[in-house]
Regions:
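Gly/Ser-rich catalytic serine loop of serine hydrolases
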Residues: 118-124
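Residue-identity detector for glycine
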Residues: 4, 9-10
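Glycine- (often His-adjacent) and acidic-residue-rich active-site loop
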Residues: 73-104, 120, 148-151
Length: 718
């Protein structure tokens, strides 16, 4: 339906927005006008959709044959909110904006029924709240998720939702952004969100309901509802305190509380004005920019420049996993959770029994916490089988190797796979550092080989580094990206290099942590500064959790392979004391039996003091700002090299690796966006300053040519 619409008699009814191609359809059935949002994939409220709604409401009110109006969504959803294709463009706020659109609906002289299915989120839910009535089918997801991109709902959601659900329920939804099933909300005592939960088909049911209420006057309106103050007078204070812990350092959740509290004190128009003021204050903030970057970057990560969406994929209906250890078991769970049959291979029955036991224990813990139904647990376990023979996995569509991180061991595995696997099977390695090109070359089918670097625990961590060797076929890349989506991973493509994107950059972060404690910082100070910046854990706590012996083994290899790279000797000194981390009760910190709380260690401090003495170093005072700058900018410089070398396709891919796999604070957007927001000329100046430190690695702090070029041109990574 374009700029104009034809009424039932055939006369052209002109739209007030005649220049806009409408993304809606309009049809009158038995006295009910049905306006369908038709802007796939989620019927986003772009300019043309908003104009179509306003035009349809006006046309229906002008037509004497229309008694009531239904607004619904074409396809599988009602409305997913704003049109992300228009984010940041003039169209996003062009007339009619969402406020005017909702006001037009609310002020309609004829009743407007929202017919909701699939999804009603963000502006879609706000649109529905502006209607006089709302009917919904079971299984619809209802949410106001704006808080997750650093803003508050901007079209009355914080004012209208408390009026129909009550303060407590609305506060929970708005501050978390979590979706809630429609049937749960429809059954909530005293709710006024839904007028009817429909059993049958949505549109016929909505039309029937519209005919029932067509003559009812006065028209109901959320505007007329009052907001009862919460039963607990401290509810808002407690909500703010809880959010300070659960959504640490995030501004938007706190401002959501302010808006909901305003709904209890102001009339609707004043409340909406307050909400709008808060929205406008947040939308241009650094946090909102970072959170939007994360939102779009996650979606962009799945796009590979030379692998178009039309690339054919290979079927993956079952997988094999080699290795039943912690990583192998976690990988198996990823596929079991997605309903994909898994065959797990080990060399000894005891290893299989131990692996199955760990998988069962993980699932049983979820059942005990109410996060997994018993029948779902049993169904997932029924998809798991085991074997001691490579011959039994020959027909798997994909096999993932998760054995010890040693090239010779992995080469033996891939030689066996090459001999037994069916033609076209995808052969994947879970290596975290090894050369996937060389792994592929031990087979006669290198095009079928790809790296799939899962992060531990694999069934929990969202990141999946997809390592593309120089041999990997394009259809293999397309297939593994599709598989990653199925198992709910954020897949980021990396080229082949030592450590790929994540571990290569993380090594520089850890190197700086070592230099900092050599120069005078304490282990606790470095960790606390990193955590105050927003990291989930500081570098030394991460080392204790992962196992300090792992980093030790990697360093011993690099001393041989890269003798010119400078490392602090503190980490070796600590590891050589047998302090391998939490698993042995002592690492950079001491740990009491059965507890994970880190306790400062006198033995570690003595080891650091000895390293300083051996090097003739006098410790100096180091500020928290210097700690953070050196930790983060070391990753930025390495990230710039990674971009220059083509290891990462784009800067946002690097950011997604760090946001989803390394605990980088999401509200800072990742290391590369952080550098952009700091300003690349300032980043270059800081690196030049760090080069003057005689105890650091001056060669490393030479800014990457790409970084220097972008800074000189006034450009950014993203």
């Amino acid at each position: 339906v374009s700029a104009g619409r034809r009424a039932r008699g055939g006369a052209l009814v002109c739209s007030p927005f005649t220049e806009i191609a409408m993304s809606t359809t309009y049809q009158v059935t038995d006295g009910v006008a049905v306006i369908s949002l038709a802007n796939p994939p989620v019927n986003g409220l772009g300019q043309s959709t908003r104009a179509g709604i306003v035009d349809g409401i006006q046309q229906a009110n002008a037509d004497a044959a229309v008694n009531a109006i239904v607004i619904t969504g074409a396809g599988k959803v009602f409305c997913g909110g704003a049109d992300i294709k228009e984010f940041g463009s003039p169209k996003a706020s062009a007339a009619p904006d969402l406020h005017l659109t909702i006001a037009t609906v609310e002020q309609s002289a004829k009743p407007v029924v929202a017919a909701i299915h699939g999804v009603a989120m963000g502006g879609g839910l706000e649109l529905a709240l502006g209607c006089h009535y709302r009917v919904v089918v079971p299984g619809t997801q209802i949410a106001l998720p704006e808080v997750n991109i650093g803003i508050v709902p901007g079209a009355g959601g914080t004012q209208r939702l408390p009026r129909v659900l009550g303060v407590e329920a609305a506060l929970q939804m708005i501050t978390t952004g979590a979706s809630v099933p429609s049937e749960k909300l429809a059954k909530a005592p005293g709710q006024k969100l839904f007028d009817r939960l429909l059993d049958g088909e949505l549109v016929p049911g909505a039309i029937a309901y519209a005919k029932e209420i067509a003559a009812v006057r006065p028209l109901p309106s959320v505007r007329k509802l009052s907001v009862a103050a919460p039963a607990d007078p401290e509810a808002f204070t407690k909500a703010r305190a809880d959010l300070a812990k659960t959504r640490k350092n995030l501004i938007a959740p706190q401002r959501c509380v302010d808006c909901v509290e305003a709904a209890t004190k102001l009339d609707l128009d004043a409340g909406i004005a307050f909400e709008r003021e808060v929205f406008e204050g947040l939308v241009t903030s650094d946090q909102a920019q970072a959170l939007r970057h994360a939102f779009f970057g996650e979606r962009a990560a799945s796009k590979i420049p030379d692998v178009p969406d039309s690339t054919p994929t290979r079927p993956v209906t079952n997988v094999a996993v080699i290795g039943a250890g912690t990583m192998g078991g976690g990988i198996a769970m990823c596929f079991l959770n997605a309903g994909v049959p898994v065959k797990m291979l080990e060399m000894k029955q005891e290893a299989i029994d131990r692996g199955i036991g760990i998988i069962r224990k993980n699932y049983e813990a979820q059942v005990a916490k109410g996060k997994l139904a018993q029948d779902k647990y049993e169904q997932r376990m029924s998809l798991l089988s085991t074997t001691l023979s490579y011959d039994d996995i020959a027909q798997a569509d994909m096999v993932i190797e998760a054995v010890f991180e040693n090239f010779e061991v992995k080469a033996q595995v891939f030689t066996k796979l090459d001999a037994v696997m069916k033609p076209g099977a995808i052969l994947a390695s879970n290596t975290s550092t090894l050369d996937v090109d060389k792994i592929a070359e031990v087979t006669k089918r290198p095009g079928d080989v790809v790296g799939l670097h899962f992060f531990s625990p694999a069934n929990v961590m969202r990141l999946l580094e997809v390592v593309r060797s120089k041999h990997t076929d394009k259809d293999v890349m397309a297939t593994v990206m599709q598989v990653a989506k199925k198992i709910k991973k954020v897949a980021v493509v990396s080229g082949v290099c030592d450590g790929f994107i994540g571990n290569r950059m993380f090594e520089q972060y850890v190197r700086q942590a070592g230099f900092l404690i050599e120069e005078g910082a304490t282990v606790q100070q470095v960790d606390k500064a990193a955590e105050a910046f927003g990291f989930a854990m500081g570098p030394f706590r991460v080392g204790d959790l992962a196992g300090n012996d792992i980093g030790y083994a990697i360093r011993q290899r690099r001393y041989v392979e890269k003798p010119d790279v400078v490392y602090s000797k503190t980490a070796d000194a600590v590891c050589e004391l047998g302090r391998h981390g939490q698993k042995v009760g002592k690492g950079w910190y001491d740990y009491e039996a059965g507890k994970r709380e880190p306790v400062p260690s006198a033995e570690v401090q003595a080891a650091i003091d000895k390293v300083r003495a051996d090097k003739g170093l006098t410790p100096r005072a180091i500020s928290d700002d210097e700690i953070v700058q050196r930790l983060v900018l070391s990753m930025v410089n390495e990230g710039a090299h990674i971009l220059e070398e083509g290891i990462a396709n784009k800067a946002s891919d690097i950011d997604m690796v760090y946001l989803t796999g390394y605990g980088f604070p999401v509200y800072r957007g990742g290391p590369m966006l952080y550098a952009d927001m700091l300003g690349l000329p300032k980043v270059v100046a800081l690196m030049k300053h760090f080069q003057q430190n005689p105890q650091d690695d001056a060669r490393f702090w030479e800014p990457a040519p790409l970084l220097v070029k972008l800074a000189a041109e006034g450009k950014t990574f993203n």
